[in-house]
Amino acid sequence: MPNNVTLHIPNLIKQIQADFPDITFEAGSHFSWHAKTRHVSYLPDADDPRSLWALLHELGHALLNHTDFSSDIELLNIEVAAWAEAHRLAEKYGITIDQNYIEDNLDSYRDWLHVRATCPTCYERSLQIDRQTYRCH
């Protein structure tokens, strides 16, 4: 496959569809993986390197069979795994993913997790009890 300069979303989609025919790709308003319907949504007009990286990241979720998560830390682990898979795919397709972009993306999850795990009363870290509830310890 060509490098980032000449590789465009439509070309990458065609190649990915040939390589992974069990996954459907649908134009949408954002990049996302839909486990129930086994399809990846993508921005059809996006044509920058970050869009290529996002597409590979969502494909990573698909190939790793990510469906759901039961805790916030599990979500973070799923995101890390999807980016690792995107890295592997990028090599296959001759794409270089900026590691700083990946870390910035993961930092947004880490920051979100930190806020959710901080008790609003005492500002100490708390423990997640279920998907929606944290308990101060």
Task: Map each language-model feature to its residues.
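Active-site scaffold of zinc-dependent metalloenzymes
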Residues: 2-6, 10-51, 62, 66
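Metalloprotease/metallohydrolase-associated module, dominated by Zn2+-dependent proteases
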Residues: 73-137
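Substrate-binding clefts and substrate-entry loops adjacent to catalytic sites
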Residues: 65-74
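Histidine-centered divalent metal-coordination motifs
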Residues: 57, 61
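Alpha-helical scaffolds flanking conserved acidic
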Residues: 49-54, 100
